[in-house]
Amino acid sequence: MKIQSSCPSALNREETGYSAQIGPDFFIREATLADAAIIWQTIYDNRVYLRTWLPFVDGLKEVADEEAFLNEQLALPYADRNIVFVIGQGHELCGLVGFVITDNINHRTEIGYWLIPEYQGRGIMTRCVRHLCEWAVSERGMNSIRIRCAAGNAPSNAIPRRLGFTLEGVEREGELMADGQYVDLNVYSILKREIENW
């Protein structure tokens, strides 16, 4: 989704928090409350595609729903927060990537992600996930990182496979999709020592 930089809901490169350049054209940075409108609009504009694999899409009825989600995360102490990162190119939002379940006691976390169709097939998400794995190990002290993907979602499954994650098994009927059907989830993991050998 293209939004002019003068628009209040444009994706701003220079917000506070962690940010990093991902390849020559793309960046990630921590999402802020100011991003709620552009995140919601991007999801809304791509809802037919995204709802196939992301059951939360139908629950985002208005910008306030995205604001509530971000507020919930931002209210937590930083060490306990499941940090969400925007993926951007200029003032365009391409998708989100972040930590969805973090267990600080056992030093493990899970990464979730989505990318709108026009940016898929370029290796963007693979680079983002790799970067966040390295960051989770070096900055957050994680030992194990997990990714769960619907078994039928080939693009999402390709990312952990490409990065050398181990397929641990299948969580049978692990997620209820928007169409009312349960789908199996492939569960992948990678360890700190494996990430350090990339």
Residues covered by each model-derived region:
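A generic secondary-structure signal
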Residues: 72-76, 135
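Acyl-donor (CoA/ACP) binding surface of acyl/acetyltransferases
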Residues: 1-38, 42-49, 84-198
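Short loop/turn motifs at secondary-structure junctions and domain boundaries
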Residues: 75-80, 165
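A short hydrophobic/aromatic micro-motif that marks alpha-helical segments and, especially, helix-coil
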Residues: 61-62, 77, 195
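Conserved GNAT-fold acetyl-CoA-binding loop/helix
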Residues: 51-72
